[in-house]
């Protein structure tokens, strides 16, 4: 875990100073095509404007890129209430959040619209004959419901579910289109309900160029939850950070630890990768294994593992804006966002990217 001298009141002040108003037309509704033709702002002592496909020119052969290889699941499902004596059958929107292994087998947390009380039965899919039965068995503090299925629902989600998209994306295209577009090219382990979007800029061709120049690759898994979109409302100290599951294999933990010991740069692809690395860091090495993290990185927190961070442009008032301010410094982030606003960068999940250097001294 990272060292922290973070003062919540200071974080409140930083968040207020970093506030910005964003015109709606600057929110990217589709990604660049090809993916690596998005813009890349390089933020260090100076700000430079490049294209994402220029990344090989900005990295060193000794660098280690660390990716989050979690895969977005089709977690948005339409369900119906059972028909009893000719009544019922109403539609319920279900957003599956994650499997709650500590509660029991085949239990998921989910947001329901409209919400249902414990004891209610739902059928996910077309109808009761072909659908999948779930019972509401509990209510969580944030309003999510616990659903217990009769069987493992995961193998059926590709058939009955749709990909969940951020609330600021107007999904005009087909679900099949989004299943390709809102997924990194290296996604592997299913479990996220939001994409680790910094990785959306990579193409197989760009990865091959990085391999050819000797940049090493490692990966971690952090299943991104819907809480990633939750804004900070009120004092930072009162914000309840969402829990997310992560895993680092023995091989990848060893590769990252070795890079740190050899003084090579670790380049985190995305804030989810930063949160995983900092959660698994014990002060001397990255620990292999699986766990759950609620890590909240705010100004005053010393980020230990990554030296560079590839990330998109985040929402005002968000935990991610505080994370990048902790990583690169408030002044640099303020200058970077001012530049992004004045130079027509595209924001949020499908927008342009930044390459941030870690601030090593105050």
UniProtKB/Swiss-Prot annotation:
Keyword Disulfide bond appears in the UniProt entry: no
A Gene Ontology term for the protein's cellular component: cytoplasm
GO process terms (BP): queuosine biosynthetic process; tRNA wobble guanine modification
GO molecular function: S-adenosylmethionine:tRNA ribosyltransferase-isomerase activity
Record key words, sorted: Cytoplasm, Queuosine biosynthesis, S-adenosyl-L-methionine, Transferase
Pfam assignment, any one: Queuosine_synth
Pathway field: tRNA modification; tRNA-queuosine biosynthesis
Enzyme Commission numbers on file: 2.4.99.17
Catalytic activity: 7-aminomethyl-7-carbaguanosine(34) in tRNA + S-adenosyl-L-methionine = epoxyqueuosine(34) in tRNA + adenine + L-methionine + 2 H(+)
Residue pairs linked by disulfide bridges in the UniProt entry: none
Enzyme class: transferase
Record carries keyword Transferase: yes
InterPro entries: QueA, QueA_dom1, QueA_dom2, QueA_sf
Localisation: Cytoplasm
Family assignment from sequence similarity: Belongs to the QueA family.
Subunit-structure text: Monomer.
Biological role stated in the UniProt entry: Transfers and isomerizes the ribose moiety from AdoMet to the 7-aminomethyl group of 7-deazaguanine (preQ1-tRNA) to give epoxyqueuosine (oQ-tRNA).
Designated name of the protein: S-adenosylmethionine:tRNA ribosyltransferase-isomerase
Biological source species: Deinococcus radiodurans (strain ATCC 13939 / DSM 20539 / JCM 16871 / CCUG 27074 / LMG 4051 / NBRC 15346 / NCIMB 9279 / VKM B-1422 / R1)
Highest classification ranks of the organism: Bacteria, Thermotogati, Deinococcota, Deinococci, Deinococcales
Gene name in the database record: queA
């Amino acid at each position: 875990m990272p060292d922290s001298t973070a003062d919540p009141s200071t974080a409140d002040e930083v968040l207020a100073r970093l506030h910005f108003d964003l015109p709606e037309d600057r929110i990217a509704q589709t990604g660049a095509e090809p993916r690596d033709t998005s813009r890349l702002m390089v933020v260090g002592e100076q700000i430079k404007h490049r294209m994402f496909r220029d990344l090989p020119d900005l990295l060193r052969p000794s660098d280690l890129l660390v990716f989050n290889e979690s895969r977005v699941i089709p977690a948005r499902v339409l369900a119906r209430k059972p028909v009893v004596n000719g009544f019922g059958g109403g539609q319920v929107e279900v957003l599956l959040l994650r499997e709650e292994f500590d509660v029991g087998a085949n239990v998921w947390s989910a947001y329901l619209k409209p919400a249902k009380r414990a004891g209610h039965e739902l059928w996910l899919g077309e109808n009761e004959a072909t659908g999948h039965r779930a019972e509401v068995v509990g209510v969580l503090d944030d309003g999510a419901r616990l659903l217990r299925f009769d069987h493992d629902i995961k193998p059926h989600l590709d058939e009955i579910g749709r990909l969940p998209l951020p609330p600021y994306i107007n999904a005009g295209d087909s679900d099949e289109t989004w299943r390709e577009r809102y997924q990194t090219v290296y996604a592997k382990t299913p479990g996220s309900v939001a994409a680790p979007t910094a990785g959306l800029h990579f193409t197989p061709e760009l990865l091959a160029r990085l391999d050819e120049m000797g940049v090493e690759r490692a990966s971690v898994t952090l299943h991104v939850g819907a809480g990633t979109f939750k804004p900070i409302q009120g004092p930072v100290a009162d914000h309840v950070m969402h829990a997310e599951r992560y895993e680092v294999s023995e091989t990848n933990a060893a590769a990252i630890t070795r890079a740190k010991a050899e003084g090579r740069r670790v380049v985190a692809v995305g804030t989810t990768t930063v949160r995983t690395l900092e959660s698994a860091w014990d002060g001397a090495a990255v620990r292999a294994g699986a766990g759950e993290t609620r890590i909240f990185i705010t100004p005053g927190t010393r980020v230990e593992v990554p030296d560079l961070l590839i990330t998109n442009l985040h929402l005002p008032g968000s935990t991610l804006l505080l994370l990048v301010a902790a990583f690169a410094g408030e002044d640099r982030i303020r200058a970077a966002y001012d530049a992004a606003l004045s130079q027509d960068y595209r924001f949020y999940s499908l927008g342009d990217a930044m390459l941030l250097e870690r601030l090593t001294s105050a």
